[in-house]
Amino acid sequence: SGKDGTIRHVFSCVNPQGCNVKSFKSPTEEENLHDFLWRIYAHLPEKRMIQIFNRSHYEDILFPAVHGLIDKKEIQERHEVINKFEEHLQNNNTIILKFYLHISKKEQHKRLEARLTNPEKKWKYNADDKKESKKWSDYMDAYQNVLEGCNKHNPLVIIPADEKWYRN
């Protein structure tokens, strides 16, 4: 969806001393030994700092839901925990802005193909990307569920991201 490029573009004029970026990948073995928000806590911003999450705690609902690793009850519980977590942060003067960069299925396919064929993009390719792209509909359902369940205190803003000029 262009998360890295969007972060670079949007925050290009921000003093880097006041801004941190954390990219969350699949949970590590150690992270899996704790509750799903444990890995997030260490990266919460200090007062007067900007903390950017490239991916976030929402991934800890999406991937497990799509792969049947958690049931509907646990999905609902995670929604509630996230809503309480975000409310707590806001009550302690943390401003939360949430953005979802949405790309179409066609655009996702195009970008995956570019990673395979364009030498400048091959480094981005992950063999799991192709497999995960086949679960497009399941991911869209999971995203819809998160959008409805985790917007209690502040909405997740959906940004059409097929076109870089619009996304950025």
Segments (PLM) and residue ranges:
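Glycine-rich phosphate-binding loop of ATP-dependent small-molecule kinases
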Residues: 1-168
